[in-house]
């Protein structure tokens, strides 16, 4: 379920009526909680937060979620370093940082999770492929241009979320791919 998408913030929920994960936390912790409550859930039902990249509209609430709510924050080492360098939340995330290697499969609450590179102007940007309850979910945010790995995952996914903004002036005048 999409809780928010766009330049003002990104956050997605994947799970069932008992437990799940968040993908990105680019809106306030209070707004996330409001969305969770509308689904009959609370932070106790969230097993972790998967981060796609280190821009503010994807990580706004990670400091609060890590420090106060004690949710594990999953990202590659490069993404965590970018978050710490750019937003100064290293102390808040000290006990909640969890690392994965891009391209290596790992598991969380019965979800098989893999990552792939996404073209974007951040420290590192990843998309997620999640196999859960016989379904394959693929999510990629802020896509600059597709790559072969993303296209292969699109062909095998049952559910696809691709988030991208198109602004011709930004493309013509900015460093975007």
Regions found by a protein language model. Give the residues of each.
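Short, well-ordered alpha-helix to beta-strand connector turns
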Residues: 46, 94, 157-158
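Active-site neighborhood of phospho(di)ester-bond hydrolases with catalytic His/Asp-centered motifs
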Residues: 23-26, 46-54, 74-77, 138-141, ...
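Metallo-beta-lactamase
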Residues: 77-127, 131-134
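Active-site glycine-rich loop that binds ribose-phosphate moieties when present
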Residues: 115, 122, 139-148
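Conserved beta-strand hairpin/beta-sheet module of binuclear metal-dependent hydrolase folds
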Residues: 1-39, 124-142
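Cap/insert and terminal regions of metallo-dependent hydrolase folds
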Residues: 148-177
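Active-site metal-binding motif and surrounding structural segment of the metallo-beta-lactamase
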Residues: 30-75
């Amino acid at each position: 379920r999409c809780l928010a998408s766009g330049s003002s913030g990104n956050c997605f929920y994947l799970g069932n009526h008992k437990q799940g994960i968040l993908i990105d936390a680019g809106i306030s912790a209070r707004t996330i909680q409001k969305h969770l409550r509308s689904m009959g859930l609370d932070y106790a039902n969230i097993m972790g937060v998967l981060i796609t990249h280190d821009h503010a509209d994807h990580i706004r609430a990670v400091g609060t979620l890590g420090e106060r709510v004690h949710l594990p924050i999953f990202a590659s080492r490069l993404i965590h370093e970018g978050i710490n360098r750019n937003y100064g939340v290293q102390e808040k995330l000290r006990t909640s940082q969890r690392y994965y290697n891009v391209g290596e499969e790992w598991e969380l609450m019965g979800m098989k999770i893999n990552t792939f590179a996404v073209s974007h102007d951040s420290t590192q940007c990843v998309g997620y492929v999640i196999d859960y309850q016989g379904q394959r979910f693929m999510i990629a945010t802020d896509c600059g241009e597709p790559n072969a790995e993303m296209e292969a995952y699109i062909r095998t996914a049952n559910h696809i979320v691709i988030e991208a903004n198109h602004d011709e002036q930004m493309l013509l005048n900015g460093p975007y791919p």
